[in-house]
Amino acid sequence: MPGSVTTAPAPAVMAGLDPAIHDLNPGDPVDDRVYPRIESGDGHDEFFDGAGDPEPLSPAGGVRLTGIDLAQPLSPAVKAAIDAAFLAHHIVVFPNQSLTREQQFLFAANFGPVEAHGAHRGENKRYGVAHVMSNLGPDGTPTFRFSKAANYHWHTDKPYHPAPPMLTMLYAIELPPAGGDTEFGNMALAYSALPEGMKRRIAGLRAVFRPAFDGTRPAVDHPLVRTHPDTGVKSLYIGNHSTHILGLPEAEGAALLAELLQRATQPRFVYAHRWRVGDLVMWDNRSLLHRAVANYEVEKYRRVMHRSVVRGTVPF
């Protein structure tokens, strides 16, 4: 098979939610404010047997968790640890997993109702399994033709829905020998770094979102600055599906969105995940943008992922 890679090393992890993380200035060193620990009631750092120390992934967010077999039911302690890491770091990486599509679906269902697949064809007709995403054509060979161009632009998943997803997870099945990364932009950090004048300018504005390739779906508007329902933290809610801003001339709104996107995707706000086979990565759609990176020969190497999306709530 072309494009094999080694499995991920086994770092370790557990992190908890600390409001101090949201007072950081971009560029601050990574320290305990960014990656606080969870402590169990008896004062021990390890939240459950088999977990080690946290491995922070970048100042922009992300943490790696080991010692968890996602193919097995989650204990209350493990679920609580994952929830805390997810809220604190926005991105959680579980390396060295071995999951069927059914097992991935069941893991995703721990976090809420799992959405049905948008494409009801071939391998994705069944509900109750993870959705197959790949660069493969009908004959099983790599091709750029079936890659969605929108995936290579900064976006959050399904913002053109009245209640966009709360989280997305991808599980790496086949990868090119190098490249095929996914980048994540931390919109909470990006918002916190805006000048106060810009924050006042965009307060109360609503952005209009449309799907990139479906002209029949009605547009939906959401707050340009949304509040996280679990943490209360504000973040920008933008991306390539946002077309204009309600109440502003279309050109002015588009220019403002472009300026915000440029500010929000500076390298200091971005974590780039370099995939390894067996990685399962889950991220918070309420506080992040993401994009695929075509930094490999798309028409030569296979890239196959399994995807699950968990339903969210109406942004406010």
Residue ranges and their predicted role:
Residues 1-22:
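Intrinsic disorder/low-complexity segments
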Residues 22-280, 285-316:
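Non-heme Fe(II) oxygenase catalytic core, chiefly the N-lobe of the double-stranded beta-helix
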